[in-house]
Amino acid sequence: MGKNVVVLGTQWGDEGKGKIVDLLTDQAAAVVRYQGGHNAGHTLVVGGKKTVLHLIPSGILRENVLCLIGNGVVLSPAALIKEMGILEEEGVPVKERLRISPNCPLILPNHIALDQAREKKRGNAKIGTTGRGIGPAYEDKVARRAVRVADLVRGGAALEEKLQEMLELHNFQLTQFYGVEAVKFEDVLALCNEWREVLAPLVIDVTKVLHDYRKEGKAIMFEGAQGSLLDIDHGTYPYVTSSNTTAGGVSSGSGMGPLHLDYVLGITKAYTTRVGAGPFPTELHYDAATDTGDAIGRHLGTVGHEFGASTGRQRRCGWFDAEILRRSVEVNSLSGICLTKLDVLDGLDEIKICVGYEDVDSGCAGSSDAVSFESLKPIYETMPGWSESTVGLTSIDQLPANALAYVKRIEQLIECPIDIISTGPDRAETMILRHPFSA
């Protein structure tokens, strides 16, 4: 029987999920995206060639792997069609390998306009969204006014009525509250009619396909976007995304019940990063634009190429935080960890790990909001670094002694086994200690 494996991020996103999903799909029959939208950026490097995906599952480069977009994803037809075109130019038969749930809510031009107008109005208090309409699209989903893929495929008067109702509200907000131009109904309808021709042949009952595969004993990979600390419920609210990025989102976003999930792999950087606003207790402040700030922060950002795959924004960098990782392990019921970018720490004289916090407000214990995080002072444990290169190593026996000690200490602190170690961006630059599909 094939196993069903979940791959998700345990930090604030950008942990290296795309590479690992791509690597592990050699044993999968299908790969599923179950939440988020095109705010994700998953980078794959195969044979030295770089591919960045935002919506399409990372298994798309594999032959004989079905790629599915589940109902929990908010789907931008414009972004998807653009991404399909780029891949098709590279010879990837996307239309043969990709299928979409009819229940995905659509991201339309009015959602993007709202998202960007809100961020602008917030000024210095902005959340740091990608401005791509993700949040407003999820709002419409919860408010039961979303236009979904099924509506797009049906077209006709029913689609027009839904668009009119949505735009009436959104345009009132845009013009009367935010003071920007309205989005024209005719323009949105014309786009929908264009998109229908491309997307209609790809629509399928994703949940049924998943259960058919399960009954046939085929292995399935569930690919998460963003990271657990950006979860709408468990993240540093309000500096979060609008979906459930933790393991619970798999079932609601795909229709695969939790008892059918066999293994949950948490992708975790060997240090910590965050892009955009929000609290970050172990941050080492560095500004790439002016080349000023903490030297270690500069090292992590420069050597780790810490710029967002979706936005190009500089990622904030800091020491590994074992305290927040313990919470991710628990919330996601992780089976194992994949530790990425260990090679970025090469050459550092010493390395710190946050093992706890000072002055935790017991009255807010368990709260994951931004206010609770802002006052936290990390308690660090210092470990010796290593001068040897770990780039491209494929066996744990090859690791320098201090690097191995660092890996083992993380395992002890987070109480979860490290099953995979990534030592570079390419598929081949990986140590697989325990394969999720055979665990």
From Swiss-Prot:
Record: residues binding Mg(2+): 14, 41
Binding site for IMP: 14-17, 39-42, 130, 144, 226, 241, 313
Any one GO MF annotation of this record: magnesium ion binding
Enzyme Commission number(s): 6.3.4.4
GO BP annotations listed: 'de novo' AMP biosynthetic process; IMP metabolic process
Main location: cytoplasm
Catalytic machinery residues: 14 (proton acceptor), 42 (proton donor)
Pathway recorded for this protein: Purine metabolism; AMP biosynthesis via de novo pathway; AMP from IMP: step 1/2
Cell compartments where the protein resides: Cytoplasm
GO cellular component: cytoplasm
InterPro entries per record: Adenylosuccin_syn_GTP-bd, Adenylosuccin_syn_Lys_AS, Adenylosuccinate_synth_dom1, Adenylosuccinate_synth_dom2, Adenylosuccinate_synth_dom3, Adenylosuccinate_synthetase, P-loop_NTPase
Cofactor binding notes: Binds 1 Mg(2+) ion per subunit.
Chain sites annotated for binding substrate: 309-315
Enzyme class: ligase
UniProt-annotated binding residues for GTP: 13-19, 41-43, 315, 341-343, 422-424
Catalytic activity entry: IMP + L-aspartate + GTP = N(6)-(1,2-dicarboxyethyl)-AMP + GDP + phosphate + 2 H(+)
Source organism superkingdom: Bacteria
Cofactor(s), names only, from the UniProt record: Mg(2+)
Pfam families (alphabetical): Adenylsucc_synt
HAMAP family: Adenylosucc_synth
Functional note: Plays an important role in the de novo pathway of purine nucleotide biosynthesis. Catalyzes the first committed step in the biosynthesis of AMP from IMP.
Similarity comment text for this entry: Belongs to the adenylosuccinate synthetase family.
Oligomer status and interactors: Homodimer.
Record's protein name: Adenylosuccinate synthetase
Name of the gene this protein is made from: purA
